Amino acid sequence: MAKLTVRDLDAKGKEVLMRVDFNVPLKDGEITNDARIVAALPTIKFLLDQGARLVLTSHLGRPKNEPDPAFSLKPVAARLSELLGKDVKFVSAAIGPEAEAARAAMKDGDVVLLENVRFYPGEKKNDPEFAKSLLGNATLFVNDAFGTAHRAHASTEGVTHFAEKSAMGFLIERELEYLEGKLENPEKPFVVIMGGAKVSDKIEVLSKLMEKADTFLIGGAMANTFLAAEGYDLGASKIEGDKLDLAREILAAAKAKGVKFLLPADVRVAMKFEDGAETFCTAPFAEGGKVPEGGMAIDIGDKAIEEFSAIIKDAKTVLWNGPMGVFEMDCFAKGTKEVAEALADSTAISIVGGGDSVTAAKKFKVQDKLSFCSTGGGASLELLEGKVLPGVGALTDKCCCGK
């Protein structure tokens, strides 16, 4: 069922509670990356231009259900004020007399940022009384925090039970457009690049995407588990020993469906796991290649890079979720870097499914050449698994006039 978007709301002169994702990195009280604040600006500006009285709520970090100055949103209010070119009033509480007074004093076009919602135990518990207090006198609710849309918390799901109408912002709308819409009937060939550490973390998304994908390209430590399941010698590489049967089941399922499931033809090996370590590529596994005793496969090899890049070049749609190796260290970054560059050079619709893959795309400066980079981690994965996100499912249906 289609949900209301911010375009469907008449916000003029009305108090609107908006859940944003301002979970930005801080160092000594200074914001080191404001990308999440910038991502929320289109929806914020849209509502302010309409003349809404906008109340923003967010979490930051993982405080222990109580106030902690290290996780205060005060620096965010200052940065948001700079970006908007207007005063953003910061309130050092999310509910209670101070928050109520600040909200009561608002005029049309004003914006207030409440203190970290996770300073209150009622947030994660999705406590109805806390949700009701957080909504306050707002009649409209807008959720634009995709990164927490998979959490049924008071500020994402609970408040919708008390608002007249609840809608998604532009950021969530765009996430759904790509992670659901573009992948509903993807242009073929549809290639899925899957990496990361654990097969067990990706089993549901692998199963779901197998219904639509033509080819899987597998990298990261999870590739080691599949290679071990095929009987190859991986030395001291990281392997999920208790998931070998699961890996074999996935390989068999792909074969039965006629889906190509490509494992790395070779891997990049180091004898020490440290930055600056010397590395070398194994011979192709099909030609008797193996990881020597004590060696660790920490990236895909040169032949694998060549094969993966050729398949990406011919694709029409590519979904990338998970790095090919430990790209944070330059000596183990080649596989992820070259796959990212192949994706950037392709004419395919390129969708990066959040988390480490987006970090890698930024590191290798290809983000602007890709069709879409998700802002979610767990939320992206759950959406790709076909799950309904609580923060989206709770929004008002398009066919309804209210809730």
UniProtKB/Swiss-Prot annotation:
InterPro entries membership: Phosphoglycerate_kinase, Phosphoglycerate_kinase_N, Phosphoglycerate_kinase_sf
EC class of the enzyme, as a word: transferase
UniProt binding sites for substrate: 21-23, 36, 59-62, 118, 151
EC number(s) on file: 2.7.2.3
Entry's Gene Ontology molecular function annotations: ADP binding; ATP binding; phosphoglycerate kinase activity
UniProt pathway annotation: Carbohydrate degradation; glycolysis; pyruvate from D-glyceraldehyde 3-phosphate: step 2/5
Binding site for ATP: 202, 328, 354-357
The entry's keywords: ATP-binding, Cytoplasm, Glycolysis, Kinase, Nucleotide-binding, Transferase
Source organism superkingdom: Bacteria
GO CC, any one term: cytosol
Gene Ontology BP term (one): glycolytic process
Pfam families assigned: PGK
Localization annotation: Cytoplasm
Chief localization: cytoplasm
Reaction it catalyzes: (2R)-3-phosphoglycerate + ATP = (2R)-3-phospho-glyceroyl phosphate + ADP
HAMAP family referenced in this protein's UniProt entry, alphabetically: Phosphoglyc_kinase
Description of how the protein assembles with itself and partners: Monomer.
Family note: Belongs to the phosphoglycerate kinase family.
Name of the protein described by the UniProt record: Phosphoglycerate kinase
Organism annotation: Akkermansia muciniphila (strain ATCC BAA-835 / DSM 22959 / JCM 33894 / BCRC 81048 / CCUG 64013 / CIP 107961 / Muc)
High-level lineage: Bacteria, Pseudomonadati, Verrucomicrobiota, Verrucomicrobiia, Verrucomicrobiales
Gene: pgk
